[in-house]
């Protein structure tokens, strides 16, 4: 009787239970905060989700019962490999910067692709693949083109790509959106979007590097899954939808077809309200009458490999802020290897949302990551950004443009400049908070929550996904996955 009632309610609501496969291999903690929220939202809508993922977060852990099931397939070797990859990036590192356009090459990124290969060769994953199960849709991490092979292995299920923030140019190309422009829509790997000849050359070089990376990935795919495995370009044809966890205003209001959905950002903030700080730390912050500055460069930066001179610059900055408490998220080994100024509390981990929501936290020195900036915006804490990799350069520049942060040059910044920037955002804190409120009003204007929007379009792909040969069922534009030589040159006669 209960089953019949539940089935009836689902039918009336326009949704039916679906079996969903999510392949989310990159072991980056902040990314999985977003993916966890998405998967749990699917389960809350009574969908059954099987997740191939590293052991970072327990997606099934929750304080409530869900009508859908979450099954986790652990690719557990990947977290250690990923740390090794980040650590090895020191060979290409500039002062304080892990990765920019000069280090984004096919050669450097093959280590990441090989990590995906090894994850999918994991005993847990091989055992799962041997079950020959069927799914209604396959959701794949947008940064991991190698994982598109799961759309082939579980065909004819349509494919959705999801990103915790910005999309890659290749993601946009796959679904027929505007993927590239050196000025208006710069590649997210660039550290500057200045529109000059150098910018155009960088765009062209990045395009060629990712084409080479795709060809090398093709060779690995055929070795791992058989000689008849489609190429990356062919696998992209299966992608029907791209979900991006940010508001389009950050992406310069890029012109996109409905196959690209900007969720608005802050998806992970829907999981649960901020937790309370531990008692001792809360006492310290309560006593910080001149304010506390929180310093964290995110979960992907290995502070053990921070350039020594950059590390000293940070310590000199903290000393200049001697009338304020500084909370510094840093590995224990680093904290023990230096002489900390008396105003610094150094720990390997802080509950970031709880810290930012404390009334005495007055500034946030950050790498400019999307999840961190979402948390700071909601807490109304002005930011000073020191971007270090990937989309952080572009995102930091946008935050400064909107008047909610200062963005500094990580390679050249001095202790005096950093201390001055921190002092400026604190002195002008009320104006920063007003601009943060205005930005949040824009971002939150859509009545649908990020989770609701993600579920709505996921369910649309599930419903119409097997009819994609009918043009009225597709969300993509006719230019989807078209080679640029055809896109610009070839016309019907």
Curated annotation (Swiss-Prot):
Keyword Signal: yes
CDD domains: GT1_Gtf-like
InterPro entries noted in UniProt: Ecdysteroid_UDP-Glc_Trfase, UDP-glycosyltransferase, UDP_glucos_trans, UDP_glycos_trans_CS
PROSITE patterns named in the record: UDPGT
GO MF: UDP-glycosyltransferase activity
Signal peptide (UniProt feature, chain positions): 1-17
Keywords linked to the UniProt accession: Glycosyltransferase, Signal, Transferase
The EC number(s) this enzyme carries: 2.4.1.-
Family that this chain belongs to: Belongs to the UDP-glycosyltransferase family.
Functional description taken from the UniProt entry: Catalyzes the transfer of glucose from UDP-glucose to ecdysteroids which are insect molting hormones. Expression of egt interferes with normal insect development and block molting.
Protein name: Ecdysteroid UDP-glucosyltransferase
Source organism of this protein record: Choristoneura fumiferana defective polyhedrosis virus (Cfdef)
């Amino acid at each position: 009787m209960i089953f019949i009632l539940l089935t009836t309610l689902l039918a009336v609501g326009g949704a039916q239970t679906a079996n969903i496969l999510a392949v989310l291999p990159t072991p980056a903690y902040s990314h999985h905060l977003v993916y966890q929220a998405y998967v749990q939202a699917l389960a809350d809508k009574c969908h059954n989700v099987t997740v191939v993922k590293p052991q970072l977060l327990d997606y099934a852990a929750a304080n409530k019962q869900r009508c859908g099931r979450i099954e986790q397939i652990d690719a557990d070797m990947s977290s250690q490999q990923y740390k090794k990859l980040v650590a090895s990036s020191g060979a290409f590192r500039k002062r304080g910067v892990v990765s920019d356009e000069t280090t984004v090459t096919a050669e450097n990124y093959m280590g990441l692709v090989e990590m995906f290969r090894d994850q999918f060769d994991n005993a847990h994953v091989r055992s799962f693949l041997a079950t020959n199960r069927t799914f209604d849709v396959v959701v794949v991490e947008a940064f991991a083109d190698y994982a598109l092979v799961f759309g082939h292995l579980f065909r004819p299920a349509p494919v959705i790509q999801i990103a915790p923030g910005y999309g890659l140019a290749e993601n946009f190309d796959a679904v027929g959106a505007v993927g590239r422009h050196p000025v208006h829509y710069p590649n997210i790997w660039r550290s500057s979007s200045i529109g000059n000849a150098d910018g155009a050359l960088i765009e062209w070089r990045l395009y060629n590097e990712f084409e080479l990376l795709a060809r090398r990935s093709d060779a690995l795919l055929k070795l791992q899954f058989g000689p008849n495995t489609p190429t990356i370009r062919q696998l992209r044809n299966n992608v029907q939808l791209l979900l991006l966890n940010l508001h389009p205003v950050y992406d310069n209001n890029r012109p996109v077809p409905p196959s690209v959905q900007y969720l608005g950002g802050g998806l992970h903030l829907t999981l649960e309200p901020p937790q309370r700080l531990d008692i001792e730390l809360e006492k310290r912050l309560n006593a910080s009458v001149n304010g506390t500055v929180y310093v964290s460069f995110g979960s992907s930066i290995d502070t053990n490999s921070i350039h020594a001179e950059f590390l000293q610059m940070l310590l000199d900055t903290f000393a200049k802020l001697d009338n304020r408490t500084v909370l510094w998220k840093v590995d224990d080994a680093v904290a023990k290897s230096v002489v900390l100024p008396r105003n610094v509390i150094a720990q390997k981990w802080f509950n970031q949302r709880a810290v930012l929501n404390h009334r005495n936290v007055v500034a946030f020195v950050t790498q400019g990551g999307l999840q961190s900036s979402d948390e700071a915006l909601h807490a109304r804490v002005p930011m000073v950004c020191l971007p270090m990799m990937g989309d952080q350069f572009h995102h930091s520049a946008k935050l400064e443009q909107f008047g909610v942060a200062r963005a500094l040059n990580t390679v050249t910044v001095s202790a005096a400049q950093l201390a001055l920037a921190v002092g400026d955002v604190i002195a002008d804190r009320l104006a920063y908070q007003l601009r943060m409120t205005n930005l949040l009003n824009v971002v939150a204007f859509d009545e649908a929550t990020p989770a609701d929007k993600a579920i709505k379009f996921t369910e649309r792909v599930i419903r119409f996904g097997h009819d994609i040969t009918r043009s009225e069922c597709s969300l993509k534009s006719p230019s989807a996955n078209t080679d640029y030589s055809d896109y610009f040159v070839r016309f019907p006669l």
